[in-house]
């Protein structure tokens, strides 16, 4: 166990110490004075409730992508509270022109109450995959983590999560994991200039805002 500096943690994680940032506020409001570290042991696997049947772990996705479907490349897409929209479709369809498979992971453990329930967002994706997207090349599975609203740093975290699930490419749109005006809308693109694909273990595909 060890003590830590809240202000130092906030600045280096979120790029700000402003308490109006929800992540910074959580550090001061929810975290104690002492942190712990060390080996992690799984005692009981948490049940994901309505998403348990759709749950996939990295060992499942690696087997599905490369042993069963024989993919060579897979693009991952982690999406938060917003329901599926045309901007998402643009990213997905562009990716499918370049890679063998698309792996969509909607977050189902969000930090704040949303207008659209997680179950409905998952149903919307399932409907589109069953009726519109190339079904054999598109895989849907929930991701039970929450946004921490770290903007560009969270985009890097999500890219690493996608890599761990077996993706070769990470799809990052504008203002990924952003909140309010704390990060400009392409900060999550620019942070990847600091890393090579070899360092991250995954290629990153960046998408700008589109309109029609």
Labelled PLM ranges:
Residues 1-84, 88-212:
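Active-site cores that bind ATP or allylic diphosphates and position pyrophosphate for catalysis
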